[in-house]
């Protein structure tokens, strides 16, 4: 969500001519994240978010746009694409694909309350239930193939012991994915990147309530348990120590179970999937840290944040 691609007033006006969302009043870049160029867009008809895709091409995007459209039609609070006048979900700016979505209420909260964690668990379970009839499929672009291709590139930059640790965990996870137990896990289309900065929370004094989920551009088909592990790994840890906070972790799990109870297979592989979720982000953040791309508003994430989770808890 860093700003890699600038948008001129002329380009913006041409873009908006294909939509029925009014005339532009202001456009402001969003500095968080490292994958796409996102902007807050105000028009005389409302508030929106413009996303320009920096890595994904137009042939890769239908899965993500159709998924959020599907979830929006199920009345879930997600950032879904607004159709063009011709019905299409995708446009182009500066030769790059882009889309427009309503700007949801709420804001980023660094340390969500136990109540917000529970609501996030409930929302995640509702999303998993909602995709039972979603027909499209997409591989995890940050899965095992990405791990294997990234490892040789990272080797010159990280200590030998750290590289050995990563290599051992990648090998262990590859073996796990071949197992009948892993193959039996309930699976479908998942967000796969539902960190705190990809959710919006409404605050009223000390009370917090989940407003919506955004940024589905790492969505893929994977075990639902993996999606839960990714979210729990980020939402329910102490930011200073990296340890799970029991109250918030329990609240998220209870929220999820209240809507979609975890299976016996889920319980058996929970620790392994927690490690897989942590490994995915440790590798990707090491990659982005040592091999960054230029951006006018780029805020890199911290790679060591996940290094302690790659072994079973």
Regions found by a protein language model. Give the residues of each.
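An alpha-helical support segment within catalytic cores of ATP-dependent transferases
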Residues: 7-19, 135-136, 150-192, 196, ...
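All-alpha amphipathic helical-bundle segments outside canonical DNA-binding/catalytic cores
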Residues: 264-274
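ATP-binding pocket architecture of kinase catalytic cores
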Residues: 43-136
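ATP/Mg2+ or Mg2+-diphosphate-binding catalytic cores
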Residues: 141, 152-153, 281-313
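Active-site activation/catalytic loop segments of kinase-like enzymes and analogous catalytic loops
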Residues: 225-261, 275-293
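Active-site acidic catalytic loop and adjacent metal/ATP-binding pocket
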Residues: 36-44, 49-50, 81-82, 174-226
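A cross-family kinase active-site recognition segment
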Residues: 110-164, 185-187, 298
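Conserved NTP-binding catalytic cores of kinases and kinase-like/nucleotidyltransferase enzymes
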Residues: 1-85, 203-208
């Amino acid at each position: 969500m860093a700003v890699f691609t600038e948008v001129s007033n002329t380009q913006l006006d041409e873009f908006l001519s294909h939509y029925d969302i009014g005339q532009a009043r202001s456009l402001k870049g969003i500095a968080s994240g490292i994958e796409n160029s996102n902007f807050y867009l105000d028009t005389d008809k409302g508030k929106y978010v413009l996303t320009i895709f920096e890595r994904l091409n137009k042939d890769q995007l239908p899965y993500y746009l159709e998924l959020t459209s599907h979830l929006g039609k199920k009345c879930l609070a997600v950032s879904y694409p607004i159709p063009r006048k011709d019905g299409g979900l995708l446009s182009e700016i500066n030769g790059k694909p882009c889309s427009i979505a309503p700007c949801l209420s709420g804001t980023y909260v660094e340390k969500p309350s136990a109540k917000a964690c529970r609501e996030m668990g409930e929302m995640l379970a509702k999303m998993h239930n909602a995709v039972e009839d979603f027909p499209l499929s997409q591989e995890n672009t940050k899965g095992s193939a990405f791990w294997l291709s990234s490892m040789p590139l990272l080797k010159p930059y990280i200590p030998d012991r750290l590289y050995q640790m990563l290599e051992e965990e990648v090998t262990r996870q590859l073996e796990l994915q071949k197992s009948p137990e892993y193959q039996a896990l309930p699976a479908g289309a998942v967000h796969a990147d539902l960190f705190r900065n990809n959710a919006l929370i409404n605050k009223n004094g000390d009370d917090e309530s989940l407003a919506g989920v955004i940024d589905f551009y790492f969505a893929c088909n994977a075990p639902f348990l993996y999606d839960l592990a990714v979210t729990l790994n980020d939402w329910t840890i102490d930011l200073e120590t990296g340890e799970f906070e029991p109250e918030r972790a329990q609240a998220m799990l209870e929220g999820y179970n209240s809507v979609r109870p975890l299976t016996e297979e889920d319980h058996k592989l929970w620790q392994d999937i927690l490690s897989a979720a942590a490994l995915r982000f440790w590798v990707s953040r090491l990659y982005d840290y040592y091999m960054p791309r230029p951006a006018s508003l780029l805020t890199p994430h911290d790679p060591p944040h996940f290094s302690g989770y790659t072994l079973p808890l």
